[in-house]
Amino acid sequence: MSSEAKCPFPHAANRSRSNQDWWPNQLRVDVLNQHSNKSNPLGEKFNYAEEFKKLDYKALKADLVKLMTDSQDWWPADFGHYGPQFVRMAWHATGTYRTMDGRGGGGRGQQRFAPLNSWPDNVNIDKSRRLLWPIKQKYGQRISWADLLVLTGNVALESMGFRTFGFAGGRADVWEPDTDVNWGAETTWLGTDKRFSGDRELDENLSATHMGLIYVNPEGPDGSGDYMAAAKDIRATFYRMAMDDEEIVALIAGGHTFGKAHGAAPESHKGAEPEGAPIEAQGLGWVSNFGDGYGKDTVSSGLEVTWTKTPALWSNNFFENLFKYEWEITKSPAGAKQWVAKDAEDIIPDAHIKGKFHKPTMLTTDLTLRFDPEFGKISKRFYEDPQAFAEAFARAWFKLTHRDMGPRSRYLGPEVPKEELIWQDPIPEVDYKLVDAADVTALKAKLLTSGLSVSELVGTAWASASTFRGSDKRGGANGARIRLAPMKDWEVNQPEQLAKVLKTLEGIQADFNQSASGGKQVSLADLIVLAGSVGVEQAAKAAGVNVSVPFAAGRNDARQDQTDVESFAALEPRTDGFRNYVGKKNGVPAEVALIDKAQLLCLSVPELTVLISGLRAININVGGVKHGVLTRTPGVLNNEVLLNLLDMGTQWKPVESDANVFEGRDRKSGEVKWTATRADLVFGSNSILRSVAEVYAESDAKEKFVKDFVAAWVKVMNADRFDLA
């Protein structure tokens, strides 16, 4: 797979320079505005889950099965079956997921947009989506592109004799690219110069080893042909997808049981990718001028490899060939490094010429599965036990294609597996009667006399709910996992204070559940959120505004055995600007981390502004530090923090001992009035954030400030309440 050192950033002479061109380090506040209703052609009231329920699922699958062997002249099917290329399409649609921030994946159909639609690793997948268009057009909005891409991969596997683990719908489309994902800083396709350090240590914020690849270079690190060195790259990227060694082997071998790679001629024959193609190409890219440009003359990755003798049928032949032969390095017609079986007969069928056969071939990264000691043990076991291999691939494929969907409660359709899987972050179903309005009033009274401060009530609820990530729908208040490992021990959650608050809340919960009649119970998850509501109401009352924070019961409490400690460790904030916390492992400026966190919480610029200034007014800062608490009346929910931040009578200067902390001094006397962090001062320095901060700091904004704070607060508290949508 050659990079050809192509720069994806051409500099058009007449292109207007953007603000980002002038100021490359400008804070990307715009990521909070992506996927607004203005870009949605279906309107605000469209409910995909309801539309999906109207889908004739059986008929759709039947149409997909027919498509598999309905070869089209403009893009003929290899081996007379489109299944392998649809498996690749589904794999590449979902395989961009990474655990560190939950971004990537197939949950929104992003493969349709740049940069993914034009990545070198996705070469000619545009043809697969065009083959699907007649079916998408037929079924309309009852099936999203995001769901269709994955379902088609499943049907492809089934049509080739494989039994899948199941399928769940529920992936709603968006209509523009995700701009919040960090794919890397390289300026050439397949570049690696910005993402590695030391002994080839991959940047902790990235998953793929090369710019424009889903995973790793199939020719080995930087095209070296070194199958032993490839093991480190493979583990680095697959581990960041939450896959273990067995899942890695199963996925690679399972995927390479089907189809072929295409390298009939040098890659110089390929035309521009979809985003760079001329307008008359109508979004199709990589048009080749070699021979017919398709079929036997296809040029995709540059590799020319067919792994098995039954490339359109499930078998164990990948492992049979891997272990049967010794391998020697060779080059494809395109010049890519690959491996051919020594002293082998021509047993591999040609994809388009009937009666023609080839020697078995493998990728460099395929040989890694045999010769790496740990991968080798697993591969040998799968070779000797085909049923174990099939089971492992089915489960790993389901995980790959569903990992970013969140809890099972979001799953739709008749093929949802009944088995509960630990990576789905399971929560027990509510099997008791929920509290009513009178119960909520009584519980609020108990909370008011509990001895817990407003800061403790609000801070604990925030700590619980703000773990939510809109990217992969993980975290949130439901489950009350803040009382379980690892969350209970996170430094940002102040373990000692948290233990004290939880003990008090558990006492209130126990008293209520023991005395309530009619089978009523309250979960700790609900009580934590209700406690936060009480704190907010008290803070608003202190500001002279009476408000009732909306509360919806229905959460339940997860168990420790339902909580994968290692998996949840990825949710621990290194920096949390909402609580003015900067951890020891923080690697980005606090204001950048704040915007990133706000985006994961699905907050708009106004919601972010009113939330953080209100939380500063209440002071839920970790350790009770006063940074950013720019008010003489902490605990009162008013706009005084913003008033003081925007006060020109204060001059801000950095503190020499801490690059994140600043002193606000009186311009006349030089006296220190306040301290603040970068996460505070950004609301005065960034022109967009300042414009919104000014609205909330105005004299007529008293009630609006509280009202908008409550709305944003409830949004975060209910972020994982998919049952309320």
Curated annotation (Swiss-Prot):
Cofactor(s) needed by this chain: heme b
Disordered: annotated segments: 1-20
Sequence position, cross-link Tryptophyl-tyrosyl-methioninium (Trp-Tyr) (with M-241): 91-215
UniProt cross-link Tryptophyl-tyrosyl-methioninium (Tyr-Met) (with W-91), position: 215-241
Family matches, as CDD domains: catalase_peroxidase_1, catalase_peroxidase_2
Coiled-coil spans in chain: none
Family according to the record: Belongs to the peroxidase family. Peroxidase/catalase subfamily.
Cited PANTHER family: CATALASE-PEROXIDASE (PTHR30555:SF0), HYDROPEROXIDASE I, BIFUNCTIONAL CATALASE-PEROXIDASE (PTHR30555)
Protein name: Catalase-peroxidase
Organism (species): Janthinobacterium sp. (strain Marseille)
